[in-house]
Amino acid sequence: MIKKTQGTEIRALARHIGMSAQKARRVIDQIRGCSYEQTLMILELMPYRACYPIFKLVYSAAANASHNRGLKEADLFISKAEVNEGVIVKRLKPQARGRSYPIKRPTCHITIVLSERPNFTLKNI
């Protein structure tokens, strides 16, 4: 299902990322509401494995905004960021004496929405 966003919202979606949604949410909660440049700095300095796919997704969304809509990257901020659980990939690990144990690899879907920060000018009354 394709959702159309109104105004100057740019939406980027990464699906089937190989990590649990809980670990990705730990990083997403830190960048929600931040500006584009501040988000990139935060993601480069955080020591979590979830930072790299989120960094790529934010960078891709900003590139789409500048190429498709002609927006400046300096005016963008993260207006919405969410992580949803994906499918669980199931594998079997062989054990001794012909037995096997299941391995469950969780995946997640990450959605980033960038918006243009409104420019307010104060008028002297």
Curated annotation (Swiss-Prot):
Location(s), subcellular: Plastid, Chloroplast
UniProt GO molecular function: rRNA binding; structural constituent of ribosome
Plastid among keywords: yes
Gene3D superfamilies: Ribosomal protein L22/L17 (3.90.470.10)
InterPro entries in the record: Ribosomal_uL22, Ribosomal_uL22_bac/chlpt-type, Ribosomal_uL22_bac/org-type, Ribosomal_uL22_sf
Entry keyword set: Chloroplast, Plastid, Ribonucleoprotein, Ribosomal protein, RNA-binding, rRNA-binding
Domain of life: Eukaryota
GO biological process: translation
Its job: This protein binds specifically to 23S rRNA. The globular domain of the protein is located near the polypeptide exit tunnel on the outside of the subunit, while an extended beta-hairpin is found that lines the wall of the exit tunnel in the center of the 70S ribosome.
Similarity-based family: Belongs to the universal ribosomal protein uL22 family.
Subunit structure: Part of the 50S ribosomal subunit.
Name by which UniProt lists this protein: Large ribosomal subunit protein uL22c
Species this protein is from: Nuphar advena
